[in-house]
A protein has these predicted regions:
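Extended, regular secondary-structure scaffolds
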Residues: 1-24
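Switch/communication elements of ASCE P-loop NTPase nucleotide-binding domains
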Residues: 1-8, 124-210
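Extended helical coiled-coil dimerization/tether regions that scaffold
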Residues: 12-17, 26, 39-145, 149-156, ...
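ABC ATPase nucleotide-binding domain
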Residues: 29
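A short beta-strand-to-loop transition that corresponds to the Sensor-1 phosphate-sensing loop
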Residues: 36-38, 64, 197-200
Length: 210
């Protein structure tokens, strides 16, 4: 709410070294995306808000619906399909998705799936082939594919992405590939991310300015 509440927030940036503070302007971030796949987290995601005229947009990527209700596999698959269609509806997004998949293919299992071939299809044929692919994936690979596809579909300039402990559901090689794909996407879109993590793999993959 500190970021998405239009005209109501008293949130500020703090410079801990200089003891200075600066209010966060209503339009500082264009959108906020929160990513959390913990089924036991007490966090209840707000309703998605995709309309920029109402303030900062908000998108949620995770397992929860409303309250304590969790999404089923069909919900997750449908969410992926809708995001994929959004990615393929615009050439720049399509190219960013293909670049992200290319980075993820440093993971051998991802490389063997032939995901980039989906870009050759559209309409019902795309839906059928994409649904078949995600149904055969392990939970970790499905989570990464859903997450990166939705991020490509939603991240715009000055988007803030919040990610909660990605290592909790991803093996190290896949986690490493995901963080690299995320970094490349955010660099391309001039976005930023805050990641809550205990993983040295995540820290290892975070880009460092010279």
């Amino acid at each position: 709410e500190a970021i998405t509440s239009k005209g109501q927030s008293t949130a500020k940036f703090y410079d801990v070294e200089g003891w200075q503070e600066e209010p966060i302007a209503n339009d500082y971030f264009s959108s906020l995306v929160s990513v959390s796949f913990s089924a036991f987290d007490p966090f209840e995601p707000p309703r998605e808000q995709p309309d920029p005229s109402l303030g900062t947009c908000y998108f949620y990527i995770g397992l929860k619906k409303e309250g304590d209700t969790l999404k089923g596999l069909n919900d997750i698959h449908q969410e992926f399909l809708e995001a994929l269609k959004s990615c393929f509806s615009q050439l720049p997004r399509r190219d960013r998705w293909l670049k992200a998949i290319d980075t993820l293919e440093s993971d051998e299992n991802f490389a063997s799936m032939g995901l980039k071939g989906l870009a050759e299809f559209s309409g019902e044929e795309l839906t059928t082939k994409a649904r078949k692919m995600i149904k055969t994936m392990s939970s970790g690979h499905a989570v990464v594919l859903l997450t990166i596809t939705r991020l490509v579909a939603t991240v715009e300039e000055k988007t803030l992405v919040l990610i909660d402990e990605p290592e909790s559901h991803l093996p190290p090689p896949l986690l490493s590939a995901f963080i690299r794909a995320l970094s490349e996407l955010l660099y391309d879109r001039n976005g930023v991310s805050i990641i809550a993590t205990h993983s040295p793999v995540v820290l290892q993959e975070i880009p460092r300015s010279s």
